[in-house]
C-alpha cells in the first residue's frame, strides 16, 4: 500500500505468481502501456503518422525530393530578384501620352484595285463606225445574216440617257403619286364591276 500512496511515482507491479501463456500476455501488454506512457511524458511526442497521398500523388519518393530541390532553387532566385528590384526603385516605367502615339487612320488608306486585263468593250460609236466601214461583213461566215439586226438598231443619241442626279424627296413624291393614281384606277375598276348592270328588256 505504501507504494500506491507515493505521489511522485507510478504504482508498482504486483509480484504475484501467475502461470500459463495468458499470464505472460497480460504482463507484456502492461509493459507496453507503461512504455507508451513514459514516451508521452518525455521529450519525444507520439510517432508521426505516415502521410498517404490520394490519386494526385502518384510520384515516387526521389522525384519528390528533386522537385523540392528545384522549388528551393526557384524560390531563392525569386527572392534575389525581388531584392534587386527593390534596390532599383528609381526606374519607374513611363506611360507615353496619347498625343505621342501616332495612330494610323485606316479610313484614309485605300487599297489599290487589282489589276486584271479585261478585253475592251466597244462603245456604240465604235460599233456604229465598224458597221459603216465594213458593210461587206454584214453576213458572218455565211451562216449569220446581220441585215435584220442593222435595220432595227437605234442610233446612239436615241438610246443614250443623260445622267440625272436623284433627289430623295423628289423621287419619293413621284413614286408615291404614281402609286396613288394606280390605286385610284384600281378602285374605280372594282366599283364598276360591282355595280349591277341595268337589265335590258
Swiss-Prot record:
Compartments where located: Cytoplasm, Cytoskeleton; Cell projection, Cilium
Biased composition (Basic residues): 15-24
GO BP terms in the entry: cilium assembly; intraciliary retrograde transport
Superkingdom of origin: Eukaryota
Keyword annotations: Cell projection, Cilium biogenesis/degradation, Cytoplasm, Cytoskeleton
Similarity remark: Belongs to the IFT43 family.
Function in brief: As a component of IFT complex A (IFT-A), a complex required for retrograde ciliary transport and entry into cilia of G protein-coupled receptors (GPCRs), it is involved in ciliogenesis. Involved in retrograde ciliary transport along microtubules from the ciliary tip to the base.
Protein name: Intraflagellar transport protein 43 homolog
Species annotation: Xenopus laevis
Record lineage: Eukaryota, Metazoa, Chordata, Craniata, Vertebrata
UniProt gene name: ift43
